[in-house]
Amino acid sequence: GSEMCIRDSLITPTDAGIQAAVRAHMAVAAYADPAFPEQSYAGAWMVIEGFEEVDDEFLERIFQRCHGQPWEIARTKRCVIRELSLEDLPALEKLYQKEGVTWRLDADGERIPGFIEPLFAKEKEKKYQQAYITNMYGYYGYGMWLVFDKASGELIGRAGLEHREFPDAVELELGYLIDPDRQGQGLATEVCQAILAFAREELDFPRVNALTDQKNVASVALLQKLGFYYLEDTDVSGSRTQRYIYEFS
């Protein structure tokens, strides 16, 4: 039949099946079966159109999504890349407090340069990340992830793929940050290569963008090493930045 149940995960073509699974606290995905038209699929974590990609990993991911467990995205030689969970916020805060990571204002209100936007105040950041987990990870299956040292389990960075609106289209943008104490070890290259491989294999975009300040020599060198080429200077959020492109040819 068109219903499948493995390890507390159910794939079903009917709203009745979905509601039964929800009541039983099971992870559930809907199968768009033409034999059961006019279903709403309310309560399902995703809707599939066939069983070609359904394997143990797929069912495990439905289970994790339903139970609020972060997905692991990739493993490199030295790192684990995975989704953020709310339990990671204290470690993320610690990383963002390091010198030069985020821009901030000095006593006179002048902007002290840094790499990225600072976090919100604690409760606001928690609400923001909860919505991000639900809406970005849950709906798109990608976003900004966390980078952990494979050996120690320590949080050493943040990297991933976001949407960026350009005048002609919404495209993917690569973002990355490595703990200042761990820079110069080739970790950013390792992590970004894994993310580009993920984008090539899993996502339906022809290319990935990266935005950087031309004064950020290390970032420009990294992008060139990864195979990005310079496209144009552009204005983003009121500041002039360089746009680089990586094509999936």
Model-flagged regions — what are they?
Residues 184-189:
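Glycine-rich acyl-CoA binding loop
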Residues 19, 23, 154, 215-231:
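Conserved active-site alpha-helix within GNAT-family acetyltransferase domains
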Residues 13, 34, 210-220:
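Conserved beta-strand-loop-alpha-helix junction that forms the acyl-donor binding cleft
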Residues 10-45:
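Acidic, Mg2+-coordinating phosphoryl-transfer loop and its flanking beta/alpha structural elements
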